[in-house]
């Protein structure tokens, strides 16, 4: 099965910026990045599902880079509702180190911190080299920004998408990155990066988003929703992760098997054919597989 076909079958593709990306994914060799801001000291299950795509693409010969946004975390991503409180710099730096150590155990790829290339940029240089390429009207039309105008948005959060666009430009010019992958809530920020690279270099780069992982009620797995399941053993033990997955509903268990495991299409379709609602058969396989992949332990249930 071709890579893009597998990603679509697993429900891991929501938007992509150009049809030519399909050919590059299936037959080319791309350097791509996926990232998170260190606003917490651990990945949660929603992050894990997104970061798994790095492994999926790496298996087909593509080169992943993982970005931890030390700079963007200090600014705060617009939520489309209300202004975030600014995080303390010391806390962000501490979170970065903890995330880096955690990520390296599961995803053995190069890790970069956008604080490293933004910390010494002067305000004048930022405005001249980057701000002049993106208009206020363009930024105001992004969906998250439009929604937040009702309650007010600071210039700090308004500038977040430009900082993320700078990341794409920096990684393109220094590491040859031509693809950014993220959750679907980041689409507006990602297309800003595409436009910034095109305007500054004349080159085409790409973006692809994944649907956010949600529960049976449509709520995403994340700390902003208050239902995060953490990867760190200090926040959720392997047993707690296992129990959570054992109790997911029949409505979403097959979808989670596709998104959270490397089980083949043949294996998952066989599990689906054998699964009967209320038996917990598919949930058991999901819980055992994901817990072992993350923590390297098997949970014996009597």
Swiss-Prot record:
Organism expressing this protein natively: Streptococcus thermophilus (strain ATCC BAA-250 / LMG 18311)
PROSITE patterns registered for this protein in UniProt: AA_TRNA_LIGASE_I
Short motif ('HIGH' region): ranges: 38-47
Single GO term (MF): ATP binding
Catalytic reaction equation(s): tRNA(Tyr) + L-tyrosine + ATP = L-tyrosyl-tRNA(Tyr) + AMP + diphosphate + H(+)
Broad class of the protein's primary localization: cytoplasm
Short sequence motif 'KMSKS' region: positions: 220-224
Subunit-level organization: Homodimer.
The protein's name in its UniProt record: Tyrosine--tRNA ligase 2
């Amino acid at each position: 099965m071709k890579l893009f076909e597998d990603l679509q079958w697993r429900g891991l593709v929501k938007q992509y910026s150009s049809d030519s990306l399909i050919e590059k994914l299936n037959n080319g060799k791309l350097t791509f990045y996926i990232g998170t801001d260190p606003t917490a000291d651990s990945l949660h299950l929603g992050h894990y599902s997104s970061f798994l795509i790095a492994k999926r693409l790496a298996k087909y010969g593509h080169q992943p880079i993982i970005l931890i946004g030390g700079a963007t975390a200090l600014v705060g991503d617009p939520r489309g509702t209300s202004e975030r409180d600014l995080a303390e710099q010391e806390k962000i730096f501490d979170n970065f180190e903890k995330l880096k150590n955690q990520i390296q155990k599961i995803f053995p790829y190069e890790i970069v911190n956008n604080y490293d290339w933004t910390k010494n940029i002067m305000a004048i240089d930022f405005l001249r080299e980057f701000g002049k390429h993106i208009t206020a009207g363009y930024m105001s039309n992004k969906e998250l920004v439009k929604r937040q105008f009702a309650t007010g948005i600071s210039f700090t959060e308004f500038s977040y998408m430009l900082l993320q666009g700078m990341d794409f430009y920096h990684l393109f010019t220094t590491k040859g990155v031509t693809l950014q992958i993220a959750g679907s809530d980041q689409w507006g920020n990602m297309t800003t990066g595409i436009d910034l690279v095109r305007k500054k270099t004349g080159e085409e780069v790409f973006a692809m988003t994944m649907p956010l992982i949600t529960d049976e009620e449509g709520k995403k797995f994340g700390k902003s929703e208050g239902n995060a399941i953490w990867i760190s053993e200090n926040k959720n033990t392997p047993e707690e992760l296992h129990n959570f997955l054992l109790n997911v509903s029949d409505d979403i268990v097959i979808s989670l098997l596709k998104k959270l495991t490397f089980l083949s299409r043949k294996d998952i379709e066989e599990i689906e054919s054998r699964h009967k609602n209320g038996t917990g058969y598919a949930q058991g396989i999901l819980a055992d597989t994901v817990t072992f992949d993350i923590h390297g332990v098997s949970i014996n249930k009597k």
